[in-house]
Amino acid sequence: MDTSVYSHALDIWAKADLTNLQRELDADVIEIKDKETLSLNSRKSLATETKKFKKLEPEEKLNNVNKIIKQYQREIDNLTQRSKFSEKVLFDVYEKLSEAPDPQPLLQSSLEKLGKIDDSKELKEKISYLEDKLAKYADYETLKSRLLDLEQSSAKTLAKRLTAKTQEINSTWEEKGRNWKEREADLLKQLTNVQEQNKALEAKISKNIDIEGNGNEDGDQENNQKEVSTRIAEYNLVTQELETTQARIYQLEKRNEELSGALAKATSEAEKETELHAKELKLNQLESENALLSASYEQERKSTSHAINELKEQLNSVVAESESYKSELETVRRKLNNYSDYNKIKEELSALKKIEFGVNEDDSDNDIRSEDKNDNTFESSLLSANKKLQATLAEYRSKSTAQEEERNELKKSVDQLKQQIATLKEANEKLETDLEKVENVSPHFNETASMMSGVTRQMNNRTSHKMSPTSSIIGIPEDGELSGNQSTILPIVTKQRDRFRSRNMDLEKQLRQGNSEKGKLKLEISKLKGDNTKLYERIRYLQSYNNNNAPVNQSTERIDVESQYSRVYDESLHPMANFRQNELNHYKNKKLSALEKLFSSFAKVILQNKMTRMVFLFYCIGLHGLVFMMSMYVINISGYMTPEVGIVQSAKSSSNLNGGLGGAEKVAAGVGSVHGINR
């Protein structure tokens, strides 16, 4: 729905001012009900009077017919006032609520918008929470990629370790196989050597066996030769083993150098891999920090953009307000241009106030007479205003009487409440004394014995004498009894005390409300008294215009009321101001000459009322017409006479004409001077 509809409805309901309208309607409804009751009572009394009038004799009916007619007229006036008041209330309400739109769709749409606003607030809070959470977990993708990289690198390292381990195992097995093969070759060589030696020894042994038969002489030499040959064979074996071991050592040294070179190369590659892994870890950490910083930067950018948008909206609203203020200023300037004659109207109003409150009756009569010459409808407007003021005065009188009755009723109710409060205070004091009696009883007995003794004594005492009313209500024993039932009596006493306190608080609240209503009624009565004095001043002001025209038909009640208000009005006037005005008028009149005083008295007589003013006006018009006709007649006659006579007669006629005009001008000048002096 468009905002213009809301603004239009807001303006209309603001102009209607529903709270004040409800307050006024409450007061108006109360007044209508009062008038209804008064009209019912008056109609009942009128019905009884008519019944009595019907039962009278014809002669008595003629005597009392004016009275019954006046009562009917009064009842008709009351009914017309009641209908006018009801119509006024109805028209006021209609004027305020005629253009007011139906608030149901507006309230429904506003409720829907409020629900949407609440949902949007919750969603905004959720979005902000998720954005904060997302900013905290901005390195999720980097962590995920790092995890994948770590998994891949761990798989690669595991594969590398497996390959290295397999290579190591293969190399160890190859080395062992090679060693075993070399050992086997060495052993085979040794075996072949041993076999050759064995064969050589067997050949030698066979030779020796063949030669044994040749003689035992050569036995020692042969033994020596055998020993030498065995030693030579052993030496050859040792040398062969030494050669093989040296070759094996040389091969092992060469293999050791190759393995040390491979080990150095492998250690350098591992260091490079560790450095690379550390650099990758640092790089991943920097990437995660970068992601967090970029997320925080993005969040800050969004918050700053949101703040910028809010500031732009505030700036636009301020610009719109400034534009509205400028338009209002332009309208005010136009109004000021339209009200450029304010000072003039203010001067006229001050003059009217002076006429109303601070000028003599003669001066005000002169001003009003001059205004009557310019505007003949002024008197009719004053008469209508007088009627309206009289109607409002009657309404205020009825209101004041009703409020006096209400004030008397409130006084009576306040007195009754005071009496009730006094009785309640006495009852409360009595209850407190009874409570003190209950609390002061000495608890020397146990519960069972005290209860039994209390019950027996209470029964005995009831046979002998009566209990007090308070004791009979709350169950307090007399002075001679013990408080055995204290544990059961105290809750009852406390409950009754609470009831008395709540009742006392309610009565105090009612008393405060009565005092506040009494103060409000006193303020309203003082306001009504001020309004009545102002209305009396206006009536005095309006009666100064038609004192000589309007007939005096006032009842004794109205005379008494007006005498009361006249006394208040006379007391409110400042005596020094009246004395100063009278002295000023006396001083002005004293400075005048006898001829001016004669002219002023003549002007006062002429301008005294409407009849004298009209007579003087017709007299002036007739005199001027007569002079004009005589001059025309003399001019026409002069043409038929001789030249000398015509000249003489024309001179005489002109002198007569000048004399008549001079007299009229003197009278007008005298009236003007008197009017200026009075001003």
UniProtKB/Swiss-Prot annotation:
UniProt keyword Repeat, yes or no: no
Effect of H624L: No effect on subcellular location
GO cellular component assignments: Golgi membrane
Pfam families found in the cross-reference section: CASP_C, CUX1_N
Effect upon mutating Y619L: Retained in the endoplasmic reticulum
Record bears the keyword Transmembrane helix: yes
Lumenal side: 636-679
Cytoplasmic side: 1-614
GO BP terms, alphabetized: Golgi vesicle docking; Golgi vesicle transport; intra-Golgi vesicle-mediated transport
Main localization of the protein described in the UniProt heading: Golgi
GO MF annotation, one: SNARE binding
Localization, UniProt: Golgi apparatus membrane
Bilayer topology term: Single-pass type IV membrane protein
Phosphoserine carried by residues: S364, S450, S453, S555
Coiled-coil ranges from the UniProt annotation: 14-90, 178-341, 385-444, 492-540
InterPro entries: CASP_C (IPR012955)
Alphabetical keyword list: Coiled coil, Golgi apparatus, Membrane, Phosphoprotein, Transmembrane, Transmembrane helix, Transport
Membrane-crossing residue ranges in chain numbering: 615-635
Function: May be involved in intra-Golgi transport.
PANTHER family named in the record: CCAAT DISPLACEMENT PROTEIN-RELATED (PTHR14043), HOMEOBOX PROTEIN CUT (PTHR14043:SF2)
Family classification: Belongs to the CASP family.
Other noteworthy facts: Present with 2650 molecules/cell in log phase SD medium.
Protein name as annotated: Protein CASP
Gene encoding the protein: COY1
